[in-house]
């Protein structure tokens, strides 16, 4: 509403990933779609999205066995279409000491895999800039106030500092993130939308 990437888009985990943890809940389709998007972004925006290596240490006290994690990583790679450079493997014992900050007492295995990292705000601005180059118009700051669906498309209403405005479009894309349900409630006639579940997560990134 106020600026590009002013909300969740600049407060994400900074990762472009398939959601390794979603394999536990059987959300294979979600993981596959996310990994497909990761592959596309790595190809079209290599200056903004790059592969990042992750390590999974397995200790005597670790709840999951190494073979279970290896199976999950192999499924992750399979769903990702075995993308070049995004594979997984085991880190040899002789290389453990090179991993800064890794506690080696009780350590039994170290697995590694790859996902992608980005600057989410820069990526969002790049997407908007690309859309403008293809003919899109940007209204900012602006607040969506409502829309009416019709056979010929959709009439969209929004406000700017200059007052209320309206435009006609063939398609309305609801990309409001956490506010998607609020946006949907302002569309007439009422449409059924899936419930939006707000979740929180954290990734610690150390140089």
What are these regions, as identified by a protein language model?
Residues 1-11:
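Glycine-rich FAD pyrophosphate-binding loop
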Residues 14-98:
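Dinucleotide-binding Rossmann-like beta1-alpha1 core, especially the glycine-rich loop
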Residues 16, 191-207:
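Central beta-strand plus flanking loop segment that forms part of the substrate or channel wall
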Residues 96-134, 155, 166-167:
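Helix-loop-beta segment of a Rossmann-like dinucleotide-binding subdomain
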Residues 140-155:
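A conserved short coil-to-beta-strand element within the FAD-binding core of flavoproteins
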Residues 162-171, 175:
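Core beta-strand elements of the Rossmann-like FAD/NAD(P) dinucleotide-binding domain
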Residues 174-190:
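Flavin (primarily FAD) binding-site architecture
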